[in-house]
Amino acid sequence: MAAVSAKLVKDLRDKTGAGMMDCKKALAATDGDANKAVEWLRQKGIASAEKKSGRTAAEGAISSYIHTGSRVGVLIEINCETDFVARGDMFQELLRDVSMQVAACPNVEYVSTDDIPDEIREREKAIEMGRDDLDGKPEQMKVKIVEGRIGKRLKELALMEQPFIKDSSITVTELVKQTAGKIGENVQVRRFTRYTLGEGIEVEESDFAAEVASMKAAG
């Protein structure tokens, strides 16, 4: 496989508007052939999706999804640029897929890692810094270990970082990029809410055996 230089990555990014990591993947998959890399990105629906991301996405739709058994429900808003695209099959499929993704990810609380508040980051840092397995390690090593753990934890909280439930080889971010590339518009997941039946309700625990015994005594 040909070496993938920084210049090749930059040139491909300038040409297609795709992200740096996507360009690296494309060049690695095509042995550094720039023309084939462009085709690879287009096949994946990634080429030019990044350039579209600067345009205003004020249209779109709010969708609801109720999981089988009616124990989990999701409300989600995804934006695009035009009402025409919002009503199209491809955008509606994205709405359904991302709604199902939220339903399947009970630990996800934010759209992206950028949305996670500083206090959450500091809390996670404090937890990791206090772990026993860091005792005795040099400070510089400790910091690197903690940063890695925090990064992993924050990704677990972010919807866009999750492996897509229908194709774990891509993330939700890549799914959205692919859709944006195919429909030719900026597409943004704006917000979501996940509901779980009975969440937040305190259920009084009872001693079933004691209840049966008391019923017999009363009888």
Curated annotation (Swiss-Prot):
Superkingdom of this protein's organism: Bacteria
Pfam families from the UniProt entry: EF_TS (PF00889)
UniProt keyword list: Cytoplasm, Elongation factor, Protein biosynthesis
Subcellular location, record wording: Cytoplasm
This protein's GO CC annotations: cytoplasm
Chain residue ranges for the region called Involved in Mg(2+) ion dislocation from EF-Tu: 82-85
Gene Ontology terms for molecular function: translation elongation factor activity
Annotated InterPro entries: EF-Ts_dimer_sf, Transl_elong_EFTs/EF1B, Transl_elong_EFTs/EF1B_dimer, Transl_elong_Ts_CS, UBA-like_sf
Keyword Nucleotidyltransferase: no
CDD domains, per the entry: UBA_EF-Ts (cd14275)
Family that this chain belongs to: Belongs to the EF-Ts family.
Function: Associates with the EF-Tu.GDP complex and induces the exchange of GDP to GTP. It remains bound to the aminoacyl-tRNA.EF-Tu.GTP complex up to the GTP hydrolysis stage on the ribosome.
The name this protein goes by in its record: Elongation factor Ts
